[in-house]
């Protein structure tokens, strides 16, 4: 089941996508998206923050993340670009939302709307950007993940008895 915040992010990505293709005003995009019956289930405040926040200065946001692209900016699909713009805005402007949540949501949205491997590109770009804009939180998350992994040199417990040599 999708949360209201996930729905808000999905609608924001759809709005940013529409803006890229049709150069519509944010108000027109919002009106069009509100016609979708699922919009009522979205977190409206988050949707508006993301849509209007990104479309207020998309050039600045894209220039901040473009250095982390492993391809030319014009080769980034409109869906991937929309997801990246939304998540980059959220990483810098929504400090109360954990970076792991922002990145995971972006990956899932890229899987839903993007191409077969688009989510990997989104993950890579956002990982690098998060390390830049939220270095302390990024290191804490990274350290936590490292500590959760079993060490390669430690034996892993199994239900099978050890084989006799």
Curated annotation (Swiss-Prot):
GO biological process, one term: transcription antitermination
Any matching Pfam family: NusB
Gene: nusB
Single GO MF annotation: RNA binding
Annotated protein name in UniProt: Transcription antitermination protein NusB
Domain of life per record: Bacteria
Entry's family note: Belongs to the NusB family.
Key word Transcription regulation present: yes
Record's keyword terms, sorted: RNA-binding, Transcription, Transcription antitermination, Transcription regulation
Organism this protein belongs to: Laribacter hongkongensis (strain HLHK9)
Disordered: annotated span: 139-165
Function: Involved in transcription antitermination. Required for transcription of ribosomal RNA (rRNA) genes. Binds specifically to the boxA antiterminator sequence of the ribosomal RNA (rrn) operons.
UniProt cross-references to PANTHER family, sorted A to Z: ANTITERMINATION NUSB DOMAIN-CONTAINING PROTEIN, N UTILIZATION SUBSTANCE PROTEIN B-RELATED
Presence of the UniProt keyword Secreted in the record: no
GO cellular component, one term: cytosol
């Amino acid at each position: 089941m999708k949360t209201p915040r996930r729905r808000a992010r999905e609608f924001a990505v759809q709005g940013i996508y529409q803006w890229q293709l049709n150069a519509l005003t944010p108000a027109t995009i919002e009106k069009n998206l509100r016609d979708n019956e699922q919009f009522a289930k979205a977190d409206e405040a988050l949707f508006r923050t993301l849509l209007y926040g990104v479309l207020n200065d998309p050039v600045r946001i894209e220039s901040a993340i473009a250095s982390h692209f492993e391809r030319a900016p014009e080769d980034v699909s409109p869906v991937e670009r929309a997801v990246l713009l939304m998540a980059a805005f959220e990483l810098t402007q929504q400090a109360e939302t954990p970076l792991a949540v922002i990145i995971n949501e972006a990956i899932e949205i890229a899987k839903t709307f993007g191409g077969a491997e688009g989510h990997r590109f989104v993950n890579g770009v956002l990982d690098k950007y998060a390390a830049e804009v939220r270095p302390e939180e990024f290191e804490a998350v990274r350290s936590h993940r490292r500590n959760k992994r079993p060490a390669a040199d430690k034996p892993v417990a199994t239900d099978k008895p050890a084989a006799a040599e």
